[in-house]
Amino acid sequence: MKMDRRQFLATTVAGAGATLLGCGGAGGRQAAAAPANPYELGPLGKTGIKVSRIGIGTGMRGGGRESNQTRMGREVFEGLLKGAYDRGVRVFDMADMYGTHEYVARALKDKPRDQFVLTTKMWVHRGGGIPEPERPDANIVVDRFRKELQTDYVDLVLLHCMMSAKWPEEQKRQMDILEDLKAKKIIRAHGVSIHSLGALEAAAASPWVDSAHVRINAYGEKMDGPIEKVAPVVERLHKAGKGVVGMKLIGEGAFRDSDEKRNASVRYVLGLGTVDTMVVGFEKIGEVDDFAARVTSALQAKA
């Protein structure tokens, strides 16, 4: 299914847009009501990349180039990806360690390349993550990524799972190579996925970071510290013009069986005003619809 921009912006989750938002202007004038759009496009910081409010992650319980999504099998997983796109999801988040590049490439092969965003991550740590022991430089890795993704460019490439507060010093070589790839338009932006408070602080202070994947929800579940410590650093990222991609909105599945916690987490993250897109590791298309409905409800409550 191909949608032009106008069609895309008009799309809302089925049944979730029945309540309309009223918009009052100066002097009490009423603008035409418009449905809340859980998939609305917005900027990823100052990268120039436009992202949908909801993105799909592909690495639930991921490692060794497989994940819950790949374990579904090709037909089911690619059907999930296509269904997400048809609903309005435009951010597809991957990583080398998830083994999901080829699945995403096949699912989106008939879609206009400028209508979706590919984000992926390279594993630089010794041990774990990916099967082989070698850790080639970023130019070699990204070239393989482009072949696997069947694309000339990748929108966002991240250094995966940064835990050390000294990662900007330790990863200087790969950072410089990624900077060169951006200058050559092989990638559009670079950044980090964060897995410690110290690494998050370093990302907020680093001019190199275009965008960061951060773990954020209302309860501190699977996060890098209590929300009262994490949220201010995320705000610094945002104010510095860096893209902010929210992860672990559902606590890596911890809130799956709690309507109250899922709703509270969505409301909390949207209320921060600092997260550009929310990436969730959906495993069923019904989960996409459910999350979109919760986002719609939260947006309407904010209006």
What are these regions (language model features)?
Residues 2-116, 268, 272, 276:
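N-terminal binding-site loop/beta-alpha segment at the start of enzyme catalytic domains
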Residues 6, 161-303:
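Beta/alpha (TIM)-barrel catalytic core signal, keyed to glycine-rich beta->alpha loops juxtaposed to Asp/Glu
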Residues 36-42, 101-102, 140-145, 196-200, ...:
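Alpha-helical scaffolding within the catalytic cores
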Residues 44, 56, 92, 118, ...:
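Conserved, mostly hydrophobic/aromatic
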Residues 46-48, 105-113, 146-150, 204-207, ...:
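Acidic (Asp/Glu)-rich catalytic clusters
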Residues 60-74, 125-136, 256-258:
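Active-site mouth loops of central-metabolism enzymes
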Residues 69-83, 134-148, 195-202, 261-268:
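Short, acidic/polar
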Residues 149-165:
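Active-site groove signature of glycoside hydrolases
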